[in-house]
Amino acid sequence: MSGISLGIPDGPPPTLAPRRKTRQLMVGDVGVGSEHPISVQSMTTTKTHDINATLQQIAQLTASGCDIVRVACPKPRDAEALPIIAKKSPIPVIADIHFQPRYIFQAIEAGCAAVRVNPGNIKEFDGRVKEVAKAAGDAGIPIRIGVNGGSLDKRLLEKYGKATPEALVESAIWEAGLFEEHGFGDIAISVKHSDPVVMVEAYRQLAAKTDYPLHLGVTEAGPAFQGTIKSSVAFGALLSQGIGDTIRVSLSADPVEEIKVGDQILQSLNLRPRKLEIVSCPSCGRAQVDVYTLAEEVTAGLEGMEFPLRVAVMGCVVNGPGEARDADLGVASGNGKGQIFVKGEVIKTVPEDQIVETLIEEAHRIAEEQGMEAVEGASAEVKVTR
Protein backbone atom coordinates (compact mmCIF):
# COMPACT_ATOMS: atom_id res chain seq x y z
CA MET A 1 0.00 0.00 0.00
CA SER A 2 3.04 2.25 0.06
CA GLY A 3 2.75 5.32 -2.12
CA ILE A 4 -1.06 5.21 -2.17
CA SER A 5 -2.87 8.15 -0.58
CA LEU A 6 -6.22 7.41 0.98
CA GLY A 7 -6.90 11.10 1.52
CA ILE A 8 -6.52 10.75 5.28
CA PRO A 9 -4.40 13.55 6.80
CA ASP A 10 -1.26 12.44 8.64
CA GLY A 11 -1.79 14.98 11.39
CA PRO A 12 -4.39 17.37 12.77
CA PRO A 13 -6.30 19.54 10.29
CA PRO A 14 -4.67 22.85 9.37
CA THR A 15 -5.54 25.89 11.44
CA LEU A 16 -6.38 29.37 10.24
CA ALA A 17 -3.61 31.84 9.60
CA PRO A 18 -2.52 33.80 12.70
CA ARG A 19 -4.33 37.06 13.35
CA ARG A 20 -2.75 40.00 11.59
CA LYS A 21 -1.00 42.20 14.15
CA THR A 22 -2.70 45.55 14.64
CA ARG A 23 -2.69 48.49 16.99
CA GLN A 24 -5.20 48.12 19.83
CA LEU A 25 -8.31 50.25 20.38
CA MET A 26 -10.98 50.42 23.05
CA VAL A 27 -14.55 51.06 21.94
CA GLY A 28 -16.08 51.67 25.33
CA ASP A 29 -15.13 48.54 27.25
CA VAL A 30 -14.75 46.35 24.15
CA GLY A 31 -11.24 45.85 22.84
CA VAL A 32 -10.76 45.96 19.08
CA GLY A 33 -7.55 44.70 17.53
CA SER A 34 -5.42 41.60 17.23
CA GLU A 35 -5.03 41.17 20.99
CA HIS A 36 -8.79 40.97 21.49
CA PRO A 37 -11.50 38.55 20.35
CA ILE A 38 -13.29 39.49 17.14
CA SER A 39 -16.44 41.40 18.05
CA VAL A 40 -19.82 41.40 16.32
CA GLN A 41 -21.62 44.65 15.58
CA SER A 42 -24.99 45.70 14.27
CA MET A 43 -26.87 48.90 13.58
CA THR A 44 -30.25 49.96 14.85
CA THR A 45 -33.08 50.37 12.35
CA THR A 46 -35.12 52.74 14.51
CA LYS A 47 -35.24 56.49 14.21
CA THR A 48 -32.52 57.49 16.65
CA HIS A 49 -34.56 60.40 17.99
CA ASP A 50 -37.12 57.82 19.17
CA ILE A 51 -35.07 57.12 22.26
CA ASN A 52 -37.29 54.45 23.77
CA ALA A 53 -37.55 52.45 20.55
CA THR A 54 -33.82 52.73 19.96
CA LEU A 55 -32.91 51.61 23.48
CA GLN A 56 -35.40 48.76 23.24
CA GLN A 57 -33.78 47.52 20.04
CA ILE A 58 -30.32 47.87 21.57
CA ALA A 59 -31.51 45.71 24.47
CA GLN A 60 -32.70 43.06 22.00
CA LEU A 61 -29.38 43.16 20.18
CA THR A 62 -27.48 42.88 23.45
CA ALA A 63 -29.54 39.84 24.45
CA SER A 64 -28.65 38.28 21.09
CA GLY A 65 -24.92 38.72 21.69
CA CYS A 66 -24.19 42.05 20.02
CA ASP A 67 -20.94 43.59 21.28
CA ILE A 68 -21.07 47.07 19.75
CA VAL A 69 -24.03 48.94 18.26
CA ARG A 70 -24.11 51.76 15.73
CA VAL A 71 -26.86 54.36 15.47
CA ALA A 72 -27.67 56.68 12.58
CA CYS A 73 -27.50 60.41 13.05
CA PRO A 74 -28.95 62.11 9.95
CA LYS A 75 -30.85 64.96 11.65
CA PRO A 76 -30.40 67.42 14.53
CA ARG A 77 -32.92 65.68 16.77
CA ASP A 78 -31.02 62.40 16.29
CA ALA A 79 -27.85 64.07 17.51
CA GLU A 80 -29.76 65.52 20.46
CA ALA A 81 -30.84 62.00 21.48
CA LEU A 82 -27.29 60.65 21.63
CA PRO A 83 -26.44 61.63 25.24
CA ILE A 84 -29.31 59.59 26.69
CA ILE A 85 -28.75 56.65 24.35
CA ALA A 86 -25.01 56.53 25.00
CA LYS A 87 -25.58 56.71 28.76
CA LYS A 88 -28.32 54.07 28.97
CA SER A 89 -27.10 51.58 26.37
CA PRO A 90 -25.69 48.37 27.92
CA ILE A 91 -23.12 48.11 25.12
CA PRO A 92 -20.86 50.70 23.46
CA VAL A 93 -22.58 53.04 21.01
CA ILE A 94 -20.97 54.28 17.80
CA ALA A 95 -22.48 57.31 16.10
CA ASP A 96 -22.71 56.96 12.32
CA ILE A 97 -22.06 60.33 10.71
CA HIS A 98 -22.63 61.40 7.12
CA PHE A 99 -22.85 64.79 5.41
CA GLN A 100 -22.78 67.13 8.44
CA PRO A 101 -19.46 67.43 10.32
CA ARG A 102 -21.09 69.18 13.28
CA TYR A 103 -22.74 65.91 14.27
CA ILE A 104 -19.29 64.41 14.83
CA PHE A 105 -18.61 66.89 17.62
CA GLN A 106 -22.07 66.42 19.11
CA ALA A 107 -21.55 62.66 19.16
CA ILE A 108 -18.22 63.01 20.92
CA GLU A 109 -19.69 65.41 23.49
CA ALA A 110 -22.63 63.03 23.98
CA GLY A 111 -20.32 60.31 25.26
CA CYS A 112 -20.47 57.92 22.30
CA ALA A 113 -17.81 55.23 22.48
CA ALA A 114 -16.63 55.93 18.93
CA VAL A 115 -17.63 57.78 15.80
CA ARG A 116 -17.81 56.42 12.26
CA VAL A 117 -17.11 59.03 9.62
CA ASN A 118 -17.62 58.67 5.87
CA PRO A 119 -14.94 60.74 4.15
CA GLY A 120 -16.77 60.43 0.85
CA ASN A 121 -19.79 62.50 1.77
CA ILE A 122 -19.02 64.72 4.76
CA LYS A 123 -18.80 68.32 3.63
CA GLU A 124 -15.21 69.60 3.44
CA PHE A 125 -14.14 66.76 5.69
CA ASP A 126 -10.41 67.02 4.95
CA GLY A 127 -10.42 70.57 6.28
CA ARG A 128 -12.12 69.52 9.53
CA VAL A 129 -9.84 66.61 10.39
CA LYS A 130 -7.68 68.68 12.74
CA GLU A 131 -10.71 69.66 14.83
CA VAL A 132 -12.10 66.12 14.81
CA ALA A 133 -8.74 64.65 15.81
CA LYS A 134 -8.45 67.02 18.76
CA ALA A 135 -12.00 66.44 19.95
CA ALA A 136 -11.71 62.65 19.72
CA GLY A 137 -8.25 62.69 21.27
CA ASP A 138 -9.42 64.82 24.20
CA ALA A 139 -12.37 62.46 24.73
CA GLY A 140 -10.19 59.36 24.39
CA ILE A 141 -12.36 57.68 21.78
CA PRO A 142 -11.44 56.10 18.43
CA ILE A 143 -12.61 57.07 14.97
CA ARG A 144 -13.62 54.58 12.31
CA ILE A 145 -12.91 55.75 8.80
CA GLY A 146 -15.73 54.07 6.93
CA VAL A 147 -15.08 54.10 3.20
CA ASN A 148 -17.98 52.84 1.10
CA GLY A 149 -18.08 51.94 -2.58
CA GLY A 150 -21.43 53.68 -2.95
CA SER A 151 -20.24 57.04 -1.66
CA LEU A 152 -16.62 57.27 -2.74
CA ASP A 153 -14.93 60.64 -3.06
CA LYS A 154 -15.57 62.09 -6.53
CA ARG A 155 -11.86 62.70 -7.03
CA LEU A 156 -11.17 58.99 -6.72
CA LEU A 157 -14.07 58.07 -8.98
CA GLU A 158 -12.59 60.34 -11.63
CA LYS A 159 -9.15 58.77 -11.15
CA TYR A 160 -10.20 55.10 -11.18
CA GLY A 161 -13.46 55.24 -13.12
CA LYS A 162 -15.37 53.31 -10.45
CA ALA A 163 -15.06 52.02 -6.90
CA THR A 164 -12.14 49.64 -7.39
CA PRO A 165 -10.25 48.01 -4.50
CA GLU A 166 -7.40 50.43 -5.13
CA ALA A 167 -9.76 53.42 -4.93
CA LEU A 168 -11.25 52.25 -1.64
CA VAL A 169 -7.83 51.67 -0.12
CA GLU A 170 -6.43 54.98 -1.33
CA SER A 171 -9.36 56.84 0.23
CA ALA A 172 -8.90 55.11 3.57
CA ILE A 173 -5.14 55.58 3.73
CA TRP A 174 -5.39 59.22 2.68
CA GLU A 175 -7.87 60.05 5.43
CA ALA A 176 -5.96 58.07 8.05
CA GLY A 177 -2.84 59.98 7.06
CA LEU A 178 -4.58 63.29 7.71
CA PHE A 179 -5.50 62.16 11.22
CA GLU A 180 -1.95 60.94 11.84
CA GLU A 181 -0.58 64.33 10.76
CA HIS A 182 -2.50 65.81 13.69
CA GLY A 183 -1.22 63.25 16.18
CA PHE A 184 -4.30 61.03 16.22
CA GLY A 185 -3.82 57.31 15.65
CA ASP A 186 -6.76 55.61 17.38
CA ILE A 187 -8.24 54.63 14.05
CA ALA A 188 -10.15 51.66 12.70
CA ILE A 189 -10.90 51.34 9.00
CA SER A 190 -13.53 49.73 6.82
CA VAL A 191 -13.53 49.57 3.01
CA LYS A 192 -16.96 48.18 2.19
CA HIS A 193 -18.39 47.26 -1.18
CA SER A 194 -21.51 45.40 -2.27
CA ASP A 195 -19.42 43.00 -4.39
CA PRO A 196 -17.69 40.48 -2.09
CA VAL A 197 -14.82 39.99 -4.56
CA VAL A 198 -14.02 43.72 -4.65
CA MET A 199 -14.45 43.94 -0.89
CA VAL A 200 -12.09 41.03 -0.16
CA GLU A 201 -9.37 42.39 -2.42
CA ALA A 202 -9.67 45.87 -0.88
CA TYR A 203 -9.23 44.50 2.63
CA ARG A 204 -6.28 42.35 1.55
CA GLN A 205 -4.53 45.39 0.10
CA LEU A 206 -5.34 47.49 3.15
CA ALA A 207 -4.12 44.78 5.54
CA ALA A 208 -0.79 44.62 3.72
CA LYS A 209 -0.25 48.38 3.93
CA THR A 210 -1.40 49.33 7.44
CA ASP A 211 -1.66 48.12 11.02
CA TYR A 212 -5.07 49.63 11.71
CA PRO A 213 -7.78 47.34 13.11
CA LEU A 214 -10.21 46.44 10.34
CA HIS A 215 -14.00 46.43 10.53
CA LEU A 216 -15.27 43.89 7.99
CA GLY A 217 -18.50 44.37 6.10
CA VAL A 218 -20.17 43.77 2.75
CA THR A 219 -22.32 46.83 2.28
CA GLU A 220 -25.85 46.58 0.88
CA ALA A 221 -25.52 42.79 1.00
CA GLY A 222 -29.24 42.31 0.44
CA PRO A 223 -32.06 40.26 1.99
CA ALA A 224 -31.32 37.68 4.67
CA PHE A 225 -30.50 34.73 2.41
CA GLN A 226 -28.43 36.61 -0.16
CA GLY A 227 -26.73 38.79 2.43
CA THR A 228 -25.81 35.82 4.58
CA ILE A 229 -24.16 34.10 1.62
CA LYS A 230 -22.24 37.21 0.54
CA SER A 231 -21.01 38.02 4.04
CA SER A 232 -20.11 34.43 4.87
CA VAL A 233 -18.04 34.04 1.70
CA ALA A 234 -16.25 37.36 2.13
CA PHE A 235 -15.65 37.08 5.86
CA GLY A 236 -14.50 33.48 5.57
CA ALA A 237 -11.94 34.43 2.92
CA LEU A 238 -10.52 37.23 5.06
CA LEU A 239 -10.79 35.78 8.56
CA SER A 240 -9.13 32.55 7.43
CA GLN A 241 -6.13 34.71 6.49
CA GLY A 242 -6.10 36.46 9.86
CA ILE A 243 -7.64 39.66 8.49
CA GLY A 244 -10.45 41.30 10.45
CA ASP A 245 -10.98 42.53 14.00
CA THR A 246 -14.68 43.33 14.20
CA ILE A 247 -17.54 42.43 11.85
CA ARG A 248 -20.99 43.57 10.85
CA VAL A 249 -23.23 41.39 8.68
CA SER A 250 -25.42 43.85 6.77
CA LEU A 251 -28.83 42.36 6.06
CA SER A 252 -32.16 43.75 4.89
CA ALA A 253 -33.71 42.03 7.89
CA ASP A 254 -34.18 42.29 11.63
CA PRO A 255 -30.76 43.35 13.00
CA VAL A 256 -30.93 40.49 15.50
CA GLU A 257 -30.44 38.21 12.47
CA GLU A 258 -27.19 40.04 11.74
CA ILE A 259 -25.89 39.03 15.16
CA LYS A 260 -26.94 35.41 14.74
CA VAL A 261 -25.21 35.15 11.38
CA GLY A 262 -22.08 36.94 12.55
CA ASP A 263 -21.80 34.77 15.63
CA GLN A 264 -22.23 31.61 13.56
CA ILE A 265 -19.55 32.71 11.10
CA LEU A 266 -17.06 33.16 13.94
CA GLN A 267 -18.05 29.87 15.55
CA SER A 268 -17.70 28.04 12.24
CA LEU A 269 -14.11 29.28 11.96
CA ASN A 270 -13.39 28.44 15.61
CA LEU A 271 -12.88 32.14 16.29
CA ARG A 272 -15.49 31.93 19.04
CA PRO A 273 -16.27 29.04 21.35
CA ARG A 274 -18.81 26.81 19.69
CA LYS A 275 -22.22 26.60 21.29
CA LEU A 276 -25.06 24.52 19.94
CA GLU A 277 -24.31 22.90 16.58
CA ILE A 278 -26.97 20.93 14.73
CA VAL A 279 -25.63 18.43 12.21
CA SER A 280 -28.40 17.14 9.95
CA CYS A 281 -28.41 15.31 6.65
CA PRO A 282 -29.71 17.09 3.53
CA SER A 283 -32.25 14.30 3.06
CA CYS A 284 -32.66 12.11 0.00
CA GLY A 285 -34.72 9.17 -1.18
CA ARG A 286 -33.19 7.00 1.56
CA ALA A 287 -34.61 9.13 4.37
CA GLN A 288 -37.23 7.32 6.42
CA VAL A 289 -38.30 10.36 8.46
CA ASP A 290 -39.07 14.01 7.71
CA VAL A 291 -35.53 15.25 8.33
CA TYR A 292 -36.40 18.89 7.62
CA THR A 293 -39.10 19.07 10.27
CA LEU A 294 -37.10 17.00 12.73
CA ALA A 295 -34.03 19.24 12.47
CA GLU A 296 -36.12 22.42 12.70
CA GLU A 297 -37.97 21.21 15.79
CA VAL A 298 -34.76 20.18 17.54
CA THR A 299 -33.14 23.51 16.67
CA ALA A 300 -36.15 25.46 17.94
CA GLY A 301 -36.30 23.40 21.12
CA LEU A 302 -32.66 24.11 21.94
CA GLU A 303 -32.55 27.74 20.81
CA GLY A 304 -30.62 29.91 23.23
CA MET A 305 -28.47 27.07 24.49
CA GLU A 306 -25.04 28.29 25.53
CA PHE A 307 -23.57 24.86 26.23
CA PRO A 308 -21.19 23.65 23.46
CA LEU A 309 -23.08 20.64 22.15
CA ARG A 310 -22.98 18.90 18.76
CA VAL A 311 -26.33 17.29 17.96
CA ALA A 312 -26.71 15.03 14.92
CA VAL A 313 -30.13 14.55 13.34
CA MET A 314 -29.87 11.85 10.67
CA GLY A 315 -32.60 10.37 8.51
CA CYS A 316 -31.36 6.90 7.56
CA VAL A 317 -28.95 4.09 8.37
CA VAL A 318 -26.32 4.92 5.70
CA ASN A 319 -24.51 7.86 7.32
CA GLY A 320 -26.78 8.19 10.32
CA PRO A 321 -25.10 5.92 12.87
CA GLY A 322 -21.62 7.18 12.02
CA GLU A 323 -22.54 10.87 12.25
CA ALA A 324 -24.58 10.30 15.39
CA ARG A 325 -21.68 8.49 17.05
CA ASP A 326 -19.30 11.36 16.26
CA ALA A 327 -21.65 13.88 17.89
CA ASP A 328 -22.18 14.56 21.59
CA LEU A 329 -25.81 13.64 21.10
CA GLY A 330 -27.63 12.30 18.10
CA VAL A 331 -30.32 10.22 16.51
CA ALA A 332 -30.20 7.77 13.62
CA SER A 333 -33.75 7.32 12.36
CA GLY A 334 -35.47 4.56 10.44
CA ASN A 335 -38.47 2.24 10.40
CA GLY A 336 -40.58 4.55 12.55
CA LYS A 337 -38.08 4.83 15.39
CA GLY A 338 -34.82 6.47 16.33
CA GLN A 339 -31.67 5.25 18.02
CA ILE A 340 -30.46 7.87 20.49
CA PHE A 341 -26.68 8.16 20.83
CA VAL A 342 -24.77 9.93 23.61
CA LYS A 343 -21.00 10.17 23.20
CA GLY A 344 -21.04 7.37 20.65
CA GLU A 345 -23.12 4.93 22.68
CA VAL A 346 -26.72 3.93 21.98
CA ILE A 347 -28.65 4.72 25.15
CA LYS A 348 -32.17 4.02 23.95
CA THR A 349 -34.48 3.49 21.00
CA VAL A 350 -37.65 5.58 20.91
CA PRO A 351 -40.70 5.86 18.62
CA GLU A 352 -40.43 8.49 15.90
CA ASP A 353 -42.90 10.82 17.62
CA GLN A 354 -40.68 10.92 20.73
CA ILE A 355 -37.37 11.73 19.02
CA VAL A 356 -37.51 15.51 19.42
CA GLU A 357 -38.64 15.38 23.04
CA THR A 358 -35.96 12.82 23.89
CA LEU A 359 -33.14 14.78 22.24
CA ILE A 360 -34.13 17.96 24.07
CA GLU A 361 -34.33 16.14 27.40
CA GLU A 362 -30.92 14.55 26.86
CA ALA A 363 -29.39 17.88 25.86
CA HIS A 364 -30.61 19.44 29.09
CA ARG A 365 -29.37 16.49 31.09
CA ILE A 366 -25.90 16.65 29.55
CA ALA A 367 -25.69 20.38 30.15
CA GLU A 368 -26.87 20.08 33.74
CA GLU A 369 -24.29 17.39 34.43
CA GLN A 370 -21.64 19.85 33.31
CA GLY A 371 -23.10 22.60 35.48
CA MET A 372 -24.06 24.69 32.45
CA GLU A 373 -27.18 26.68 31.67
CA ALA A 374 -28.99 24.71 28.99
CA VAL A 375 -31.58 27.17 27.84
CA GLU A 376 -32.07 30.84 27.24
CA GLY A 377 -31.01 33.01 30.11
CA ALA A 378 -27.27 33.15 29.74
CA SER A 379 -27.62 34.16 26.11
CA ALA A 380 -27.55 37.88 26.91
CA GLU A 381 -24.06 37.57 28.36
CA VAL A 382 -21.54 39.34 26.15
CA LYS A 383 -18.73 36.95 25.27
CA VAL A 384 -16.14 39.44 24.09
CA THR A 385 -13.36 40.20 26.56
CA ARG A 386 -13.85 43.63 28.00
From Swiss-Prot:
GO terms for molecular function: 4 iron, 4 sulfur cluster binding; 4-hydroxy-3-methylbut-2-en-1-yl diphosphate synthase activity (ferredoxin); 4-hydroxy-3-methylbut-2-enyl-diphosphate synthase activity (flavodoxin); iron ion binding. Disulfide bonds: none annotated. [4Fe-4S] cluster binds at residues 281, 284, 316, 323. InterPro entries: Dihydropteroate_synth-like_sf (IPR011005), IspG_bac (IPR016425), IspG_bac-typ (IPR004588), NO2/SO3_Rdtase_4Fe4S_sf (IPR045854). Keywords: 4Fe-4S, Iron, Iron-sulfur, Isoprene biosynthesis, Metal-binding, Oxidoreductase. Pfam families: GcpE. This is 4-hydroxy-3-methylbut-2-en-1-yl diphosphate synthase (flavodoxin). It comes from Corynebacterium urealyticum (strain ATCC 43042 / DSM 7109). The lineage of its organism: Bacteria, Bacillati, Actinomycetota, Actinomycetes, Mycobacteriales.
